[in-house]
Amino acid sequence: MPLLSLQNKNLFLEISPEMGASITKFCDRKKNKDIFRPFPKTKKITKNNCYFSGYFATVPYFGVIHKDTFFYNNKYIKLSRTHPLEPDTIHGEGWVKKWKVKKQTKTSAELIYVHQGKSSFPHKYQACQKFSLNKTSLNISIRLTNLDHLPFDCGIGFHPWFNISAESKIFSNNFSFIENNKNNFKQKKLTSAKLLNLNKHKID
């Protein structure tokens, strides 16, 4: 499956529908600098190599499901492991599945993934992800539609890897990050603007 290329006068974006609708390249054209981590030329486009991309989305849940099992609606739900490098299931199905291209223009693309609910996550749903370039910004939106006859809880995550350097910074008035270990997750407020900077690119 070919890669999708979007661009305007400032930015270039490359997406792999086959590899979980992940971003393989996102760069500043004028400065010739990568904003997201570029996909290595030594790696092949396969579903498990999305870990080496610059971004993927997580649907219908984000994070680790320990022991591949969770309790919901008075019963235990057993999930399949999503990635061979992970000891537990993680991040849902979307990041390791093929997505279909619904629409594409020079500066935008819309991709769809449908989970039938017959294996792993037990409910049927459709995820629609839209990428669009607007001047110096990349906008990503995800819409998840319940196609099942039963309601279910879900969570959507955006998982980028920024191409940073020792001088990198993030400029934000309200930024937090999740620190996790085997036992729990802790959300921390960023008190210093000197953590990251995305190679001094201004990213919205």
Report each predicted region and the residues it spans:
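Extended, loop-rich substrate-binding clefts of extracytoplasmic carbohydrate-active enzymes
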Residues: S5-Q7, F71, K75, S80-K135
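Beta-strand-rich N-terminal accessory domains
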Residues: M1-S80
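Short glycine/proline-enriched turns and hinge-like loops at secondary-structure junctions
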Residues: S16-M19, F121-Y125, C154-G155
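Active-site/ligand-binding surface loops and adjacent short beta/alpha elements
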Residues: P151-D153, W161-D204
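Glycine-rich, pocket-lining loop/helix-strand segments that form or immediately flank
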Residues: D34-F52, I77-K98, K169-N180
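Short, well-ordered beta-strand segments enriched in hydrophobic/aromatic residues
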Residues: N10-I15, Q129-F131, L138-N146
